[in-house]
Amino acid sequence: SYLSGESSSMQSFYLLAPTSWHKNPDGTWANSAAGQLAAQLTEGGDFVDEYNKFQTTFTLRSDIIPSLLSLNADYTFRSEKRNYDWDYKKYRIGYGPNDVRELGNTAVYRYRMDYDYQVLNLYASLNKQFQNHQFSGIIGYNQESYDFYRVNTSITDVISSSLPSISLALGSTNTSDSYTGWAVQGVFGRLNYIFKDKYIVEFNGRYDGSSRFPENDRFGFFPSASLGWRLDQESFFNVDAINVFKLRASYGTLGNQSVSDFGYIPSMSTYNNGYLVDNNRPLSISAPGMVSSNYTWEEVTSQNIGLDIELLESKLQFNLDLYTRDTEGMLTLGKELPSVLGTSEPNENAADLRTKGWEVAVNYRDNVNFLNDRLSFGARLTLADAQSEITSFDNPNQNLNQYYVGAQIGEIWGLTVDGFFESEEEITNSPDQSSMVPWGAIPTTVGSIKFADINGDGVITKGTTVADPGDMKVIGNSEARYRFGINLDFNYKGFDVQTFFQGIGKRDYYPFHYVFWGFHQQPYNGGFTHLLDYYRAADDSPEAMSQHSQKYIDMGLANANTDSRYPVLQAWNMDVNTYGAGSTPNDKYLLDASYLRWKNLTIGYRLPGEIIQSLGLSQVRVYLSGENLMEWSEISDIVDPEAVTNNGRGYVYPFQRRYSLGINVQF
């Protein structure tokens, strides 16, 4: 809402005080934070999002030598167009009886985006089998391109809110446009050999070029190889219960180009200066940032061993993979440069990363005779884990604000909390923690957080290096561990049910979040009931008790609370936007971000054949489906646990619960 000068985002609800009312007795919107926000959302304008997508795929196949050699081609074109239209209107606020005023501004904002994506694949495939030998191979060419165009225009002071048009406005106009795009071009090949259905060898190779890298460093070759051995086909393997027993191993390299489209080109931005020349703010151009000559593909080399087992007539399947993945030349900010340089470090192939992990999948499928009909059912469980560590980076001092050798990806450095201060004497005799005071101006008092002096120097400090971390240490890790998924399904007499659960078994999360801290962070933030569990040193006096409402007393707010979740009620005490206590993670408020979510449930029914055949149809299925139905997590009251990304705050709109009713008809 920057055009209208108002704030009407969903985020603003978090800042509302619980005492802010939204409507006056006469039904008009109140002149309060809640009233103005509600008026903006209901009367302050319209937003239309129009989205059109077109996609087509052409395929061509020619069997040059039937059952031996074929030529294939496919081309896909996808075009997406998106139009955003914002029309901002004034809204009415009741200041008193018969005193209704219009507030806000009028504005029109038009935003147009076009996406075009194209991919072309040309390849020849060869298949040949004789006696116990089977050969197959592919050689081909691949080309992809993506183009994005954007143009937006805005203008203020619309003459009539009933005619929201750019040409019917008197205010200042702001227009901008942008373009970005990328392209990939390469050749690829694969050769596969199988002997007696028990020895498997495969070789792969790609030679790819990306427009995201400089011309001289645009192409890279990425080979791989894999082996497989079906032990169950060997004469010495005689285990009736095991239908398949297969060992696998692979080694290969892939290229990663997940960087900005033109990151290798020095770019300059334009802006209007804050001073006037001839009554105009002059246009200025910023100095270009630095780019590095060491800027090309990340090379990701993977080593994998695996095991596949099938039991009970292949009803029960088990898959296990163990892998090590080395990323060489990871594209990230390079070595820290002197601050007097006046610009930040450029992205370059500056770091190496090693990831070790494993994946397990168990699948069971069967059908039984139940009440004279077949009941089929299945279950699948997947579980995976991985940890990543920096193995190379030019940071000899091991500064904590950059990668360093031995750093675990996602590690959280923080302070240790030693309870709350319980007396002024304890404050006086404790280590100096003034550097942790937000804004340097909020007094430490009874009920304030007490930090532990880990290094014993008598001062609570945040260090800067691994060797000198001050009173900080690694207290957790924000990376997701033990990702799991559970699929269940069954079919019986035309009914089918599928459900899916997913989750994360371990993840740490520090709440840099307004909902968690509320008025403990900033005095104008909103309040929630969990925030009332703050430190209170003693019961209120009888005189103070007599002035409290019964509700206040019943909630325990007049009683001592020394074993509280939050510190003493003190504005700015836990401000996360400063160098102080709130902005530095600590172990007391480190939360468990593991979760289990009921992701999907679908119940369907296929109409009997005699009914649909009489209608000239081949199949009719009706279904009811729900998504994001329920979740179990310690943090679900403040953020959506699935929306929490690595080192992210999770301060986004949560995943919505969706319900749908539909019908599938086949003719």
What label would you give each PLM region?
Residues 1-16, 20-24, 28-88, 99-416, ...:
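Extracellular/periplasmic, surface-exposed regions of secreted and cell-surface proteins
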Residues 33, 463-464, 500:
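Short linear motifs in exposed loops
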Residues 92-93:
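Extracytoplasmic assembly/pore-lining segments of large envelope/extracellular complexes
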Residues 240, 327, 389, 457, ...:
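C-terminal beta-signal and adjacent terminal beta-strands/loops
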Residues 348, 358, 367-478, 509, ...:
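Conserved small-residue
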Residues 475, 486-487:
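Long, compositionally biased low-complexity segments
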Residues 479-483, 490, 598:
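Short, well-structured alpha-helical interface segments that form or flank functional binding sites
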